[in-house]
From Swiss-Prot:
Positions of disulphide bridges: C94-C172
Pfam families with a match to the protein in the record: 7tm_1
Organism taxonomic ancestry: Eukaryota, Metazoa, Chordata, Craniata, Vertebrata
Main location: membrane
Organism domain of life: Eukaryota
The organism of origin for this protein: Mus musculus (Mouse)
Function: Receptor for UDP-glucose coupled to G-proteins.
Name this protein carries in UniProt: P2Y purinoceptor 14
GO CC entries: plasma membrane
Molecular function as annotated in GO: G protein-coupled purinergic nucleotide receptor activity
Example GO biological process: hematopoietic stem cell homeostasis
Gene that specifies this protein: P2ry14
Residues carrying a glycan: N2, N3
Membrane topology field: Multi-pass membrane protein
Keyword line: Cell membrane, Disulfide bond, G-protein coupled receptor, Glycoprotein, Membrane, Receptor, Transducer, Transmembrane, Transmembrane helix
InterPro entries for this protein: GPCR_Rhodpsn (IPR000276), GPCR_Rhodpsn_7TM (IPR017452), P2Y14_rcpt (IPR005466)
Amino acid sequence: MNNSTTTDPPNQPCSWNTLITKQIIPVLYGMVFITGLLLNGISGWIFFYVPSSKSFIIYLKNIVVADFLMGLTFPFKVLGDSGLGPWQVNVFVCRVSAVIFYVNMYVSIVFFGLISFDRYYKIVKPLLTSIVQSVNYSKLLSVLVWMLMLLLAVPNIILTNQGVKEVTKIQCMELKNELGRKWHKASNYIFVSIFWVVFLLLIVFYTAITRKIFKSHLKSRKNSTSVKRKSSRNIFSIVLVFVVCFVPYHIARIPYTKSQTEGHYSCRTKETLLYAKEFTLLLSAANVCLDPIIYFFLCQPFREVLNKKLHMSLKVQNDLEVSKTKRENAIHESTDTL
């Protein structure tokens, strides 16, 4: 997991354009933070009223929590990268905040994979009942996912235990001991592997569902396939989000990690890999703004509760306007009488 906080490259002497790393990227993260906090706050409020009656709803609720926690790390990155905060902020990002960011990003990725598996099982294997579709199993699996991700990530916090050599130029890799640098590299490879496995499974599930829908349509040519088509579109939307938000970062991730931990890269190469990593990571962070849209299209109970809350709000507003109009009419009538 990349604990690089200041977006300065690790080995000196290397210099680069700070306009990108200290101004443009922090501003963009600030925009993502505000938008994501608003959308995920609303999503969390809506899901509070949605019963956990199905596996995929449980998985969606876990994604809401992961996105919200991930979004809370953005202000620290903004303060650290822009130089607006004290040097202790950069140390905190290296040791804690960046780890939380990546844990929650991969938790979200895994749960999207589980949602796709749930949809696949429901459509392609509808006659088979399985414990993996039970609510209790989904809750247990959710706990195991969080525990696994924390198990992989927490050593990055513990092993980032070296003192700060220069407060004006804090490099995250310099805060790690020897074992910490090795774990950093190994955990990166593990997390990247998890992503590519989930992404390939998404493609397999989507392909299988599409084939099933096509065969059902040829056999029946009835509206009974409309629900399956909707599920296919839902999984396609998840695949699309993966392609836009996560694939670019995971293409850039491995070469950037190697440039951090190996010494034979030129400054120009390090700079290029740094910019590639930062902008693709920003795309991954922007996923917290897209997930609430997926909730709306993927989860019917979510839509129902949202519509109910909106109608209640509109009703209260209309009642207030009617009450205000009645009071004004009563005042006018009393004035006319006088």
